[in-house]
Amino acid sequence: MRNNGKKIRLLAVATLLASQLGVFNSAFTVVADETTASTSEPALVTNTSSEDGSTNHSTSVTATTEVTTSASSDRGEIASSSSEDTEEKTVKIGEIQGEAQRSPLEGQKVAIKNAVVTKTDRYGFYAQDIESDGNSRTSDGIYVVSKYKVKVGDKVKITGTVKEGYMEEVTLGAGKTFKEPTNSLTVTMLVDAWITKDGTAPLPEAVNITAGMPAEVKINPTAYDPETDALDYWESLEGMLTVVKKPHVLGPQYKGDIYVLGEDFTGLPLNNIGGLNLRPHAQNTATIPIYVGNQFVAKAKDYFAEDVTGVVTYRNSFYKVEPTQQLTVQDGGLQRQAAQTQPSEDKLTIASYNIENFSANNAKNETPEDKVTLIANSFIHEIHNPDIITLIEVQDNNGSVDVGTTSGLESGRKLASRIKELVGKSYEYTEVAPVDGADGGKPGSNIRLGILYNPERVSLAKKEAATSNEAAQFDKGHLVKNPARIAPNDPSFDHTRKSLAVEFEFKGKPVVVIANHLKSKIGDDAIYGVSQPAVEHTLPTREAQASVIHQFVQEGLKQNPKTTFVLTGDFNDYDFSTTAQILAGNELTNLMSQHDAGDRYSYFYRGSNQVLDNIFISNNMAAKATFEPVHINASFMKEHGRASDHDPVLVQIDFSGAQIPGTPTDDQKGNSGQATEQTSPSSSNTGTQLVPHQAQANEQKSSTSKSLETTKDEDEKQEDKEEAATETKTPGKRKILPSTGQETSYLALFGVAVATMSLVWYKKKRMTH
């Protein structure tokens, strides 16, 4: 009895000390052998390392999750599950992963007896079966949430509970509240894990990720088919070692990721910089994101001289590879280009440029002076001082500092002033200020469309400017007020930028320039998301906006068929989209769709070169127009001279001859169609002389069931906001353990858990004697 009493007292003391250590441990962080793929603040937890053959319990705590949904689909969201202690089942990792997006053993306690550590990070490690189950439809790898210190190559035995969770939650900083990602898949992981080292083992052979990649994400939301569905193919590799053969880079590093193609990729023709352009109904699933960290500098055409090996994970609604090696990129030699279009006396040159949240506020996180100079120099040296420059994303004078100001005159004039300082050329600026807070964009910034013009080359039609809510109208073919916004009170323009119409005169001829920044793609489904088929939820709004703008142009041409209309801007939609088709109708020519296919892009996002910026011209002058995108930004990082996230696009219109009669010919009608093939990397990058052609309407059918989830700058800015919201500080609350997607246990439950662990330890120790 004395011995039993002594043991009970020792157990109670151990329990108390363990509870106190649980709080004390929050003051320390242990960093594993390799850095994590997240830049988030780590959860603050210690661990106790042990020698080979010893056992250590993970400090993870598992409870019931908050979110419950139907489990009828293997692509569903997290379902509630219990983590009550049960006898573990010995399985291979492939059995845990299963032939589905979710584990068939979710919520169950399992034991893995013969695995090797393939990669570590601050929150746990990746393990893979030493002997595969031979089933290519199931992954042999898994992520283990644990602070137990292991090294790559350690042979381990693991006991833990199967969980479908989020890597964003695992890497969440201490004291921050987790917000479940919208439309995001989960990652199969082990939590509440016990780890036993058992010597070392060689790493399994990495799977060539390019070799088996399907060409699309199929629209069957329930069937699991990794042979033909890219989403399921990625799932079949989740947590496994993979390799990309000597990849080349497709675009600039963004948020720590680069997109690449392996040297063995043969699926599609490449564009003129070795990338893949978006095309109708093509998702470019072969592009592979690799995490490299946000200090890594890379641009399009750079390459790796050796294979890149890493494990597959999923976060922020897409799969990626986290390398297991130090990467060194080689310079591929891509240079920022200058426009081939040169100024000409009888030719009107118009540029469209998204200058990415530009204001007169020169604070570091607003528009610093070096950015002003970069953009001004791009006007001077890369696009050769156009006569008219339409500006997208001009903010009010204070930038994002919200003091109720809506005027952006100081912002526009600051850019004009910098151009004059650098080259001596004078530009004037015009705009119509929005209603405060009514046009979307960065909070407090009131972004709008603005126009710079050279008064020595063009004259602004002398009219009173419209107010924010006055709609642009024509009288005898001329704007009643100038400038004016198109249908500012139309519901399709709620909380987004209103198109700006400005009438100029060039060589005695009227030219109406309409600057546009249509509804962003924020809210569209991700290709690699829960919702399948993915849907472009924002497309109907852009289609409605396009219809309003087109009707406005129709009315102007009806009143004066000789007026030249030029529509410029960031349309937040592709050159082959139904939005572009509606805009063009029978009156306008879609210039980008006529351009060389291998050079047809102005933006880069998630692996694809794409068109968001475009110019449309009325058919009465289309045959006299030369168009080109000027690739100075989208493929580059700031370190290479990038001034914005968009490339400018440029049109030059020859007014030296007679204007084509106002009524378009059959060949000039409906020019939103285009060829979809791409050229080889040696394709010409010159400007394109345009001849309108009949629309290929069969390629322009509206489809909200097949999304090309390749969103633009505002989507990325929204991601920043969502990430900030995900990591909102919780006053007075501090998480001690890495989050596992379940409620933080109460203190009493924690004490019971520690007591139980102590008892287990005691029993095991007793059994060894």
What are these regions (language model features)?
Residues 323-662:
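Divalent cation-coordinating acidic motifs and surrounding scaffolds
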Residues 1-5, 40-43:
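N-terminal secretory signal peptides that target proteins for export/translocation
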Residues 656-658, 726-742:
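Short, aromatic-rich amphipathic segments at membrane interfaces
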Residues 84-349, 353, 357-361, 366-385, ...:
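Extended non-catalytic accessory segments flanking core domains
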Residues 25-94, 106-107, 662-733:
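Low-complexity, acidic Ser/Thr/Pro-rich repeat tracts that form intrinsically disordered stalk/linker regions
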Residues 20, 734-766:
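A cross-kingdom C-terminal cell-surface attachment/processing module
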Residues 12-23:
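Bacterial N-terminal signal peptides
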